[in-house]
Structures are given as structure tokens and as C-alpha cells.
Amino acid sequence: MKFKDLRDFVQQLEQRGELKRIQMPISPVLEMTEICDRTLRAKGPALLFENPVGFDIPVLGNLFGTPERVAMGMGAEAVTELREIGKLLAFLKEPEPPKGLKDAWSKLPIFRKVIAMAPKVVKDAPCQEIVIEGDDVDLGMLPVQTCWPGDVAPLITWGLTVTKGPNKERQNLGIYRQQVIGRNKIIMRWLSHRGGALDFRDWCVKHPGEPYPVAVALGADPATILGAVTPVPDSLSEYAFAGLLRGSRTELIKCRGSNLQVPASAEIVLEGVIHPGEMANEGPYGDHTGYYNEVDSFPVLTVERITHRIKPIYHSTYTGRPPDEPAILGVALNEVFVPILQKQFPEIVDFYLPPEGCSYRMAVVTIKKQYPGHAKRVMLGVWSFLRQFMYTKFVIVTDDDINARDWNDVIWAITTRMDPKRDTVMIDNTPIDYLDFASPVSGLGSKMGLDATNKWPGETTREWGRAIVKDEATTRRVDEIWTQLGID
């Protein structure tokens, strides 16, 4: 099922019983977080708070609170279908040379489809139905959540940030949290390796001292939102990928105050500039780790213009100790990652990011082991192949007889197939999420790889244990007489 905009998605979710309207007045300060957290843990519906206390704009929460709704947002009917999206991305990331003329013709429709999904620029758009500029700009009109008791200020969480580097042809989309610090000021918390930060750095080098244009789209259609958090190949724009998911070209409109292009159907758009050198301390905020992060300095965006649809919807979320929405997104996107990794490492059978590991900090990989040291090659590959895993602290590699998604299996493999000294890989001074306060230096720490595979000659000189396997005939016999035994 495809959705033309956020409102279409909301309508379809409501028809399926996947969205609940809350008419009782609810405060964006703490109350919405508590309600959304309880609902998410119960695998409940998306929530539309129609009467947020003190505001006229409704708040949409828990939108991607189940893997099934994430799959729906990506145009899939089931989570299992996300593997096919991963296969497409794997192909586009590293297309294989055709094996012959017939193979070349068979692949041609894929490239035609990608080319056909180039975004379409329109002259008029719903996101600019209402325009607020200059002294009339007031971020206080938005029902921005204060999620946790220790949060320093309201926090914009689902803003789709649009930037463009001076040396790049296409725009970058990224989702960075934004602290509101004034009627027209927000802090842009982008980490140094993220696309927006890199674009801004390049701008400062090429245009020193000049203001840098930025736009933030709130309430885009689900395909565009999810396209921004998916490992899209550098050769494919997030807008084009969203078109592939949606089955129709992404409509964009030029911002009123810059050449940046934003989703035409977005509910709300913030337009502004970052003045080089204008920084502010961000935080503390409760984060996906389950802790409050330390205070750090980031650029300030001066909002010069707010445009929005008539009767807009404000899309919001919270982050906290898993499960939260980022963890649920991780569970769904896990299925997209698997084919991409398998294209590079065909020996990988499964790849799993346990949600309790804060979405990406731990990975479990099962492989068809082929030679001594194979597990170490795979763990090094996980850390280096995709940017999404540069912050993964722990990689556990097991044989394919282990279920990567069953901790009973994984712990059994670790405790029976590992020698802590021989089978542990430690790497110092690697990139680490600055929110990881356990690292000795902000943004820099170590990684651990655990080789929980059966050891081959060359890895051990001892006779290796053989796993106990039940006798099939006995199992069938007991199956036949089980009900007669009266044990259950």
C-alpha cells in the first residue's frame, strides 16, 4: 500500500484500527511521553492527540511504534517484505556486471524505474499554504514535547533536515534532534560524520563567514521520512528512494528563502540559516541509551520563516531506554540491512541488532564458516562496510546452527565455544557515539568482537566438542505416545 502524504497514512492506519484519536486534553510536557511509552510497550496503535494543552495543532505520536507500521510506511505489507527492499538497495549499491545480453536486458527495468523516480519540482504546494515570516515567527506555536523530567527544554525530534553542500549536486536528508532555545532559534545537534554536518563544514570552507541555508520538514510522507534513515547508496538520492518505496515521484517545492527543496506535502517547514560561529550548549536530554546525555556545543539555526499546511499535524516522538521508536525502527530496518551485508559477505546467514542494545550498539552475526579466522574477517567487515555500524561496540559472530535472535542460543555459543583471550578482538581509538558516556573520550572509544564459532584446526589443538543431537526415531516414537503419557 502506498501513501501520498502523512494524512493519507493516518487515514489508512485509522481504517485498519492502527491509530487512536485522543480527544482528552493532554500536555506535551511529560504526559504524551508517558502515554506513548505505555502504548508502544503494549504494541498499541499510533496516537493522534487532538487537543494538546496550550496549543491548537494536534500531535501525532507512536507512528512507527511497531515493525509492521514501519513496513507499511515503506510500502510493504509485512516486515518480511523489507528483505526485498534490502536486495534492491544491495543491487543499486554494487550492481553486478551483466553475464550476457539477456541478463543485461533483465536488469534494464530496474535502472529505468530508478531514473523514472527522480523527484518532481512543483510550483505550488500544501506545505506553503500558510507563510509566517520575520518578527511573526514564533516556534512557541508548535506543541513541541518535553519528554523527560530532566530535559532542559522542548525538543523537536522528527525534523527532516535538508542541507546541500557547495561541492555536491544533490541534497542531503537527515534526522537530527533540535533543542528549542528561543522564538526563532533551535540547536542543530548533528554529529561530525553526519551528512548535514559535513555539508556545513564544506560550506564554511568555501564561503567563510556567510550564513548557511537549512530547512527542516516536519510531517513528511512516511516513505520520505523512512528513506532518510535507510542506508541509501550515495548514487541514489533519498527523495528518489522514497519515490521507489511510494511508487510515485516525490514532489518537492523550492523554499521561499533559499534554493533548498522540501517535500511538497510536509505538514510544517522551518526555513532558516546557520551563522558560522554561532554555537550553543545542547542538553541534557534523556536519550535512546536510557540516560541523560552530557552537554555539548552545536550550531544554532535561526528560523526566518515557518510555512505549513492549513490545520497542520505536528509529528513527534520520544527516545529512552529500549523499547522506544528508534529501537522499533531498528528491528524493522534490520531486515533491510541483511541483504546488503549478504551481498558483500555471502557467508552471512543472519544479522541481528538486538533492540535492547540501543538499536545499533551490539550486533549478532551467524555465518557459514569456511576457514580459520573467518569470524574475525566478518566482524571487521561489519564495522567498516556500512556507516550505520561505525558506532557498533560489540559484534558477536556464531556458526549458522545458532539462532542469532535467540539469546539462549547466543549465550550458549559464547560460553561453550569461546576462550576469552583467544577469541576476543579489541580495537582501540575507534569512532563512538558521543552519547556513549562509557567511552574514555567523547566520540572515541574501543570495540569488542567475540568469535563464538566452532574452532577449526589452526585455531585450537584440542579435540573439539560435538553437539548432542537427539535420536530421530526415538523422538518420533515419543511424539506418538506423548498424549497417552498424561504428562501435559
Swiss-Prot record:
Family the entry assigns: Belongs to the UbiD family.
GO molecular function, one term: 3-octaprenyl-4-hydroxybenzoate carboxy-lyase activity
Cofactor binding note from Swiss-Prot or TrEMBL: Binds 1 prenylated FMN per subunit.
Subcellular localization, as worded in the UniProt entry: Cell membrane
GO BP annotations, alphabetical order: ubiquinone biosynthetic process
Cofactor: prenylated FMN; Mn(2+)
NCBIfam families: PRK10922.1, UbiD family decarboxylase
Record membrane topology: Peripheral membrane protein
Subunit architecture: Homohexamer.
Binding-site positions, prenylated FMN: I175, Y176, R177, R189, W190, L191, R194, G195
UniProt protein name: 3-octaprenyl-4-hydroxybenzoate carboxy-lyase
Entry EC number(s): 4.1.1.98
Principal EC category: lyase
Gene Ontology CC: one annotated term: plasma membrane
Keywords tagged on the record: Cell membrane, Decarboxylase, Flavoprotein, FMN, Lyase, Manganese, Membrane, Metal-binding, Ubiquinone biosynthesis
Metabolic or biological pathway: Cofactor biosynthesis; ubiquinone biosynthesis
InterPro entries xref list: UbiD, UbiD-like_C, UbiD-like_N, UbiD_bacteria, UbiD_Rift_dom
Reactions performed catalytically: a 4-hydroxy-3-(all-trans-polyprenyl)benzoate + H(+) = a 2-(all-trans-polyprenyl)phenol + CO2
DNA damage recorded as keyword: no
